[in-house]
Amino acid sequence: TATVFVGVNSGFNHLIRPMFYDSYHKIENLSNPKGPERIYTVVGNICETDTFAWDRKINEVREGDILVFRNAGAYGFEMSSNFNSRLKPAEVMVMDGNVHLIRKRDVFEDLLKNQIEVL
């Protein structure tokens, strides 16, 4: 059978652990939680080895669906980077079924704020 890829609006610059350590993060489709399960390879938007999961059962994914990567934890942010001038995403914590924003996403000015004018 053919490999079916799901491309997400993220990359290893946001969660590098799967690439470095082959770490497992459960991926769920929040937009279609009761859809039929399909087998997907989930890839990011960076031009390097940017694969989050191979041959993973996920409820059917459609364009625009929101996927969650479970248990990214503190290492998600601490190991993230602005590789290829990509902005860091917001972080949310789910506790007792409630979603809490715990870190705002970067804005373009965040990429430039520590640069020093040389010339």
PLM ranges: what are they?
Residues T1-L119:
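Charged (often Lys/Glu-rich) extended helix/loop segments that serve as interaction or gating elements
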